[in-house]
Amino acid sequence: MTRRVPAPLLVLAAIVSVQFGGAMAATLIPLVGVFGSVTLRLTIAATVLLVIVRPRLRGRSTTDWLVVAAFGGILAMMNLFFYGALARIPIGVTVTIEFIGPLVLATVLSHRRRDLLAVAGAAVGVALISGIAGTPWAQVDVTGLGLALAAGAAWAGYIIFSARTGARFAQLDGLAIAMTVAAVLVAPAGVITAGSAIWTPDALWRGATIAALSSVLPYSLELIALRRLAAHVFGILLSLEPAVAALAGLLVLDQQLSAPQLLGMVCVVAASGLVMGRRSVPSAPAALAETTNQ
């Protein structure tokens, strides 16, 4: 059935799924905290992937395990930073600022000086989104902005190690193992900080929904789409994520953005489309930049 659906529509469906999963995560954080939310998301997603993928564990080299372990560690940090930012600032702002990570990485890999102008435009966009220019410093949520930037840096690291892991592990084997590593790293703190609240039906169904929307469904859709979609087209579609995140925040969380913030979002989306939408951008970052962080 998915063969009849145009690949761009599959990617758009994956983006919508991820961002609404992120908006759903913002409703889980007040119940079990950041660590508890990340624990539920990673543990459930890892369990589903292990059952579906059944990764091969034998015959792996030491380097294979080091690479996938590093991938899992970055995956854990990326989720913690992202959820930490979600707890403090709107999801549209979080995703837009986080997007600077893969944008800068794509610019560095492109080796084109003019792409620096796009990064500069994105920086202006982030300044508008954060409200730093027109808001007293004491009222700026510096911690939230810092966590979003840290999530972006981790996202760039995820792209790099995702490519390295993909080169060493067949299909989704590496992702399933890395997700398990991330879950093991975060789970102790998540269970301790959330306490009995993490086992309540409300928390569990929200966690399962987030895992499905943010991991299982988009991974499946993208795996199909990327087999018949050019990397530069994928990059253009990817640049729509901040806008979709803002829409999800409005519909699910009633988070409304100001005119300057919307203008800043346009700057980041335009910069991302220019850099990651070019045919000369290396395919690995474009193909791997999508949403495991959310």
Model-inferred region functions:
Residues 29-77, 104-105, 154-161, 176-193, ...:
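Transmembrane alpha-helices of multi-pass small-molecule transport proteins
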Residues 100, 114-133, 248-250, 260-279:
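Hydrophobic transmembrane alpha-helices of multi-pass small-molecule transport proteins
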Residues 28, 37, 41, 85, ...:
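Hydrophobic/aromatic residues within transmembrane alpha-helices
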